[in-house]
Amino acid sequence: MRVLHVCSELFPLLKTGGLADVIGALPAAQLAEGADVRIILPAFPDLRRGIPETVLVREIDTFAGRVALRYGHYRGIGIYLIDAPALYDRAGSPYHDASLYAYSDNYLRFALLGWMACELACGLDGYWRPEVVHAHDWHAGLTCAYLAARGRPARSVFTVHNLAYQGLFSADHLSELHLPAEFFQIYGLEFYGQISYLKAGLFFADHVTTVSPTYAKEITQPAFGYGMEGLLQALARQGRLTGILNGVDSDIWDPQSDTLLPTRYDAENLQAKAINKTHLQTAMGLQLAENKPIFAVVSRLTVQKGLDLVLEALPELLALGGQLVVLGSGDATLQEAFLAAAAEHSGQVGVQIGYHEAFSHRIIAGSDVILVPSRFEPCGLTQLYGLKYGTLPLVRHTGGLADTVVDCALENLADGSASGFVFNECEAQALVKAIRRAFVLWSRPKHWRHVQRHAMRLDFGWQLAAVDYLSLYRRL
């Protein structure tokens, strides 16, 4: 089966979020299952540098000007790059300028991505033509609309990684996008008078997926649907909405082989994990104390991630004898609050603003608990990394967090299924109660080790998702 993934990021060459991790791992897992998989992306500078050897497939005239499609390989996967320097050759983020303002021509930049994917489905590359086109998030949403406009030359799947980002643009641009005028309606890509690239993907795809079973249910409700819940309810009734859990790339995230760690370890050698803890405490200026559990945050610092709750719960966490490590960036108010906490609680709170992939590995390996108290979380990867590294996740019961972490309630400890700590209400007091339960388990090292080992043996590899996606493609 020939599959084309349409997206805007690819780990490790270009990453702004979890989408890049998915595209860096899922195609390879599908290839291992026998699929013929390729990816199409805009030729952003980081991607051009990372894939320097490419050949010209075709040059064509488009609504965005003359465009070259180039082809190369990265880690065994075929990669198409859309070479349009006027649109894509910009330093920094693929979505916004240095002042964090979205590029004014994003409507054109990402429409071209969908257009070129559709052209491949129509035979642009005479040597390869996809049977299934799999578009990811709003950046690729118009892919499904272009395929529908061209008579559906390939089957289409659209994956929602985060429904909150909808790709909304002025209806004035419709004439520039070479889409049928009749597509701009409620039963189409119109959303409150604007063009929604996300809705285009949802409405015109043959099948819609999202990145966990629970999130697939949640987004059919007003609290999580961002105005799309009616359409998503209809898709669910038609059997066209599926949740498939993301996985962990074990080539990158595995404490047995992770070269970014001071000391590698596994479930049978957890003493070596303590060495990583000492290194982390030293690096973050924390008191060296093996008996103090380290709670870690590796995240965008936003209210959506529930990190305001962490600040509210911090006094209790410290009073109980814990330490806090934070790596991330985002909301300026939250950044300042965490930095102030580090200054006030020197030796017990360490904060690093920014994101460093290598250091994120060291934090997850060196910590005892990874905090993911999100208000909503489509899937979440951080808690999966925590499980893999024996760093017990403390999460809110939402989205993929609900699907992957089993609370250390007595009955779950008794039957051996417990893998972390879960709270329900989106309130600081609920988080505090979960933190207290973590300390209770911490005070019983034998039970803590038992939960750690169980968590580390859970299988959240990408092969499971790859098989599920390929099975879905065959049913279309």
Curated annotation (Swiss-Prot):
Keywords: Glycogen biosynthesis, Glycosyltransferase, Transferase. ADP-alpha-D-glucose binds at K15. Disulfide bonds: none annotated. PANTHER family: ALPHA AMYLASE DOMAIN-CONTAINING PROTEIN, GRANULE-BOUND STARCH SYNTHASE 1, CHLOROPLASTIC/AMYLOPLASTIC. Pathway: Glycan biosynthesis; glycogen biosynthesis. GO terms for cellular component: cytosol. Synthesizes alpha-1,4-glucan chains using ADP-glucose. GO terms for molecular function: alpha-1,4-glucan glucosyltransferase (ADP-glucose donor) activity; alpha-1,4-glucan glucosyltransferase (UDP-glucose donor) activity. InterPro entries: Glyco_trans_1 (IPR001296), GS/SS (IPR011835), Starch_synth_cat_dom (IPR013534). It comes from the Bacteria. One of its GO terms (biological process) is glycogen biosynthetic process. Belongs to the glycosyltransferase 1 family. Bacterial/plant glycogen synthase subfamily. This is Glycogen synthase. Its EC number is 2.4.1.21. The lineage of its organism: Bacteria, Pseudomonadati, Pseudomonadota, Gammaproteobacteria, Enterobacterales. It is an enzyme of class 2 (transferase).
